[in-house]
Design a protein with these regions (language model features):
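Extended, solvent-exposed, turn-rich assembly/linker loops in the middle of proteins
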Residues: 5-39
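Extended oligomerization regions of viral-like shell subunits
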Residues: 32-96
Length: 96
């Protein structure tokens, strides 16, 4: 899994790419509310947009099937519900 470099989510500037902007907005939103995001799952169409963006900006070494952004895994799956993005969270651990 490759880590996408040079993306500072504390001072995020839009990249003019809907896929990476959606992923960044999702991570920023979850951090704002203190939610522990494990993974972002993109539909095939949006993952292909992200893959093209990574290839154009970072070269062939980033033309992979999975990435991470700020510790959040980004991957492609078939989504049958018509949504473009799904979120997967870490399970809460009970304190005894």
């Amino acid at each position: 899994m490759k880590k996408l470099p040079i993306i500072d989510l504390n001072n995020y500037q839009k990249q003019n790419n809907i896929a990476i902007d959606m992923c960044a907005a999702c991570i920023i939103h979850n951090r704002k509310f203190g939610l522990r995001l494990k993974a972002i799952i993109l539909s095939k169409a949006y993952f292909d947009i992200l893959k093209k963006w990574a290839f154009d900006n970072y070269g062939e070494e980033f033309a992979e099937s999975e990435w991470s952004l700020e510790g959040v895994e980004i991957r492609k799956e078939t989504i049958w519900t018509g949504k473009t993005l799904l979120q997967e969270y870490f399970k809460n651990e009970s304190v005894n």
